[in-house]
A protein has these predicted regions:
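Internal catalytic or translocation cores that form aromatic/hydrophobic pockets or channels
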Residues: 1
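Exported/periplasmic ABC-transporter solute-binding proteins
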Residues: 4-17, 22-180
Length: 180
């Protein structure tokens, strides 16, 4: 099973003939602004504050959450003004490190991160309207095996569409739809 923060790689696996079943979207990620600074309320307006010198986001060329962050800033005409403050992580994990270590005063990340058991309740975060960015499709594909079929992998692939999985995903800040 290959699980991805977008559909690009699951689709590439299918196009390469390596998928046992078609890739599918199992949830949609949500974008938030997050800060570990005491007394700082993350908001798009507050990104312009002179006390904010670094804004973390994942590299928009390769990371879906970085692409979404860039879209939000473009829709609010903030990108030119904030360009000098932007600090790019090569992944959402590195971006989160910039935020949690306060190397960046604020950053764009996944809601699932701020709701995770190890980080829940740390810092302040603000959800950003999903209307401001292209939906962040979370994808999964079942990969072919040369040997016998892996029934555990198939069960997990199917589980991601179950009501139990959807409830778990919602608890961790993902959006799920009935048709998924």
């Amino acid at each position: 099973v290959f699980v991805s923060a977008n559909m690009k790689y699951p689709n590439e696996i299918e196009n390469s003939g390596l998928a046992a079943l078609p890739p599918k979207v199992y949830a949609f990620g949500k974008l938030v602004l997050w800060s570990m600074r005491d007394g700082f309320q993350p908001s798009l307006d507050n990104l312009k504050a002179p006390t904010v010198r670094h804004i973390a986001l994942a590299n928009p060329k390769v990371a879906p959450y970085g692409m979404a962050a860039e879209q939000v800033m473009q829709k609010h005409s903030l990108l030119p003004e904030l360009q000098e403050k932007l600090v790019f992580g090569e992944s959402i994990a590195q971006t989160n490190q910039f935020i949690t270590t306060q190397s960046a005063e604020v950053g764009f990340t996944a809601m699932s991160v701020v709701l995770s058991p190890t980080l829940q309740g740390k810092g302040q975060w603000t959800p950003l309207s999903p209307e401001l960015y292209t939906p962040i499709e979370q994808g999964v594909v079942l990969i072919k095996r040369k040997e016998k079929e892996n029934s555990a992998a198939r069960r997990f692939y199917d589980f991601l569409s179950s009501s139990t999985a959807k409830a778990i995903l919602q608890d961790f800040g993902y959006e799920v739809e009935e048709g998924l």
